[in-house]
Structures are given as structure tokens and as C-alpha cells.
Amino acid sequence: MRDICAKTQRDTIQRSMPITKCQVVLVCAIICNCLILFYVSHVQNINGEWFEQSRLAAIKQKIAFGKTKNAAEPSRQFESEVTVVFLEFEEFENDLPRTIRSILDHFPNIHVVVISRKRPYPPLELPNGKIQLVVQEIQPDQKQSSGRPENYITTQYVMFVPDSVRFDSTSLPVMMLSELKAMASIKPQVKVVAVPVKTRMAIQCNNLAFDVKRWTLEYSVSEEEAESYYRTCDSVSPSQVILLKTAFLHSLSAPYMRPFPESVFIQASLHHIKTKLLHKMSFSPGFKLFTNAHTAWKFENNVKTRTNEMYLKLGVKKVAHPSGQVSWYGCAKDTGRCFGTVYDDMPEYLYMSRWTPPCCLNHLRETAHYLFDILNTAGVRYWLEGGSLLGAARYGDIIPWDYDVDIGIFQHEISKCSYLAEAEKHSNSGTKFIDDKGYTWEKAKEGDFYRIQYSQYNHLHVDIFPFFEKDGVMTKRTWFKTHRQDREFPASYLKPLETIDFVGIKASAPNHVREFLEFKFGKGVIENPQYPNPLKLKKKSIVKY
């Protein structure tokens, strides 16, 4: 009975609410719109697998087409717009003739320039064609212009090819050119296109930060998600073929510096220029080089020498690699420091708009640590003085452009430290005391104070000024008239001594540090960085970060 009632109720509702044609049409329209939106979303999803595979397949098809069809017109255009340059090769063993022949097989009228620092020996047996050997070290009877590669490159684009590469067709080089041209309007910051040479080594796409002021180069693995067929990088390694505009190449300070193209990537990073890496494409490798121990050693030694020369020219002292390893290219214990004699308290690097090289700062920190340990062990009280105390208050470290460390000690405690006693004794005989760690101790020639140097060759140092109390005032026997902070001060600032963060440790310092510094330097000295003698610089003296 209940089922019959329910059925009757449903029939009544259906009769009272009939489905109209408009409702049917509306429902169909909604369904169609949903299907269209789904389709459009699927097609336009540039990160989707379908788009990526389709785009890559199209490129591969284009390359395959070039291998089987006569692409005369694009080839002729490539020949007229591009110069092929060889810069990275070894004169004692190379695959240059075969590499050039493989290019001429596909681009018989291409202009090829081979650049060598000195005339190659044994002589290169280059094939016939439009090939120019440019020797950068010219003979006395030659014009200077004859050794300048830019005088032989007249095309709009230049392609750098490493040694021992094979061109299998015209299509990949032609595609590189079209990709570079397309970037001019789409991504103007991309001015280099790179294609790797097929090797067992994984291709690396790195970010690159060149801090010129701090002499530091920092690499990191690019975490940018790869596009369908390319990646955007600051630096690419290992071997690759690169294409770029000639005008951009010649706008760099050292366009033909080796190792290449790393030298270009470093310089380009200063202008925020990116490289488009076609990481799913590759050129075929040629003849395997440096297969015996002797030639491998010669090659590795040459690369090391060129790398050192490149960093010297670019002013790089510290390189942080993607692995976290750090390489140093500055001064050491057995070399001189990175800068010469300082005049007017202004080191030469300040006139270059640079700060203290990081290797020098590290050696100053090491020397300070070493000295503080010795003084603490001997029971000699010390405190940070002058710019070193200012650096501690402002940065917890040495001022980034400072070139030494200054401390004060109590004169009556000098005899407690055997190293200072040795320095005094050697000073009387006109020599310096070198301890068993290689540090050099001396009585300074400039006045009545002591100095510890990083080594007998590297004169980065800590100055040790003996003070004594007189009528409640700390004074000393030697003063520097050009240092406004070099003045007497109340002995109460040393009663008691406090500690402050400096070079990674807790160092001794006067009490009421801010008050002490403003007494010596002036109001607001901590918050207002300034070079020691700013009037010597034409630009503003206020330091910008």
C-alpha cells in the first residue's frame, strides 16, 4: 500500500513539473561548454606531457628532414650570417682538420676563423676553404690589427665550435640560428644558444653570480624547471657549441679569453645575459684526444694555467662550485698579499670600486685567531682598537674594505709574551722573528709598537699597540696624525674589559663599545660607513650596499 502511494505521489509531481525543451537545450549547452573548456585547457597546457612530446617530435622531425632533403636556402643564409670560430684546441694534439672538414661538407662556403695565441706548432693542416688563421701574438714587423680576431669576423653571428666535433647535417646549426633570432623579441636577455657535444658526462646548467666588489664567483645548480626542449642557464658545461651575436661578443671586455666559453658566461653574467641550452639535442663527438698519460697531463696543465690567468684578468679570488667546494686564486702563505703598499690609508682596490680580497680577509682572520690564542695563553690582556673595533660593532667581523687588524695591550704585560720579547730582541739586531708556524713578528719601523705578519712573504698583519695609564688616561708613545681615532681615552673603558663578536670568536673589547667608538670617531659612526679617506675618491664616500 505504501509503494502504491509513493508511486502516485511521484506521478503527480512529474505531471506538475514537465521538462521543457529550453531546459534540455540549456543542459546540452552546459555539457558542450564543459567539454570545450576541458579540450582547450588540455591543448594549452604548456607544461603538459602532450605538448612537450609534440614540440620535441617536431624539432626532431625538422632535423631528420634536413638530413634527407636539400635545404639549400637555409644553408646559404646560415653561411652568409654566421662565422665559425675555433678557439679551444691544443696545438700538440687536435682533431681540428677533420672537425673543419665535417663542417665544410654541409656548409662549403662558411667562413671559418681559427684563433691561436701563438703560431701553432706543429703547423695545422687545414682543408681548403674560406679559412683564416689568426695568431694573436704578432711579429715585430706586423700591424697590431693583424692579431685581433674581431677584424676577421664580419658576419652578424658567430658560432664557437670546440675541437673534435662532427656536424651530421645542416639542420641543427640552422635551428640554433632560428632559435637565437626568435629570442630577440621573446626573451631579449637570452643572447646565447648552446647545444652540448654528446659525451658520457652529464650536461650541467648552472646559475652564476659574479660579485666583482668582493672578487667572488659563485656557481649553483639551476633549479629552474626545464621547458619542453631547452633550459635557461647562466653557465653550461662541459663541452658545447655556442652561437651568439657578434656585436654582443665584442661588447665584452675580453671576448676571446680562454677557457672558452666559460670566460664568456662569466662576463655575460655581469650584464644579466642568459644562455638557452637545447639540452635534448647534441652534436656528435669526433676523434678521442689525450688518450695517453703524457698528453692528458699536458692538457690538464694547460687548462689549469689558462683558468688561473682568466681569474687573474677578471679579478676573481674565490670560486664557490655547485658541489659546495671552494677554490682560491688569491694570495697564500708563500706569496705576497693581493695589494701593494697603502698610501693615504686607501688601498689600491678601493680605486677599482672593489673591497678587500676574500683571501686577504681570511688570512687576517687566521692571524688574529693565532695572536689572540697566544696572548690569552700568556695572560696578556688585549682589546680591539680603531677600525677593528668598529668592524666588530658594525659587522661582527673585519670591515669589508679594511687591510689590517689593530689591537691594544697593556705595556707592562709585554714581558709575559715570549713572542713579543723575541720580536724586540730581533729588532735590535735588524732582523725579524719567524715562529714555527711561519708567522713573522717584528718591532714596527713606524714607531713604538709590534706587528705580527701572516708570513715572511705575505705581509697581511695585526698591529699591536702598547698603552699605559697616566692620570686615569690611556696613552702611548706613537701616534698617527692622519688617524683621527688615534687619541688618548679614559682608562675606565678598560675597567673591565668586555667581549664582542669578531672574526668568528668572542674577542676582548672596551666596555660601552658604542660610547667608546663615538668618542674616537664621532657620533653615528657605527651606522654611517665611510672609507678612510673618501676625498681621494671622485665618487661619493658613503658606502652603498
Residue ranges and their predicted role:
Residues 2-63:
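N-terminal signal-anchor transmembrane helix specifying type II single-pass membrane topology
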Residues 140-157:
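Active-site nucleotide-sugar/metal-binding loop of Leloir-type enzymes
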Residues 23-31, 35, 353-376, 424-520, ...:
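Conserved catalytic core of two-metal-ion nucleotidyltransferases
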Residues 154-169, 408:
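Short beta-strand-to-loop acidic/aromatic patch adjacent to the donor-nucleotide binding site
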Residues 168, 172-252, 432-467, 474-482:
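Conserved catalytic core of nucleotide-sugar-dependent glycosyltransferases
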Residues 372-405, 415:
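Active-site nucleotide-donor binding segment shared across nucleotidyl transfer reactions
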Residues 29-34, 53-70, 229, 236-239, ...:
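C-terminal catalytic/acceptor-binding lobe
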Residues 78, 98-110:
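Short, acidic, metal-binding catalytic loop of nucleotide-sugar glycosyltransferases
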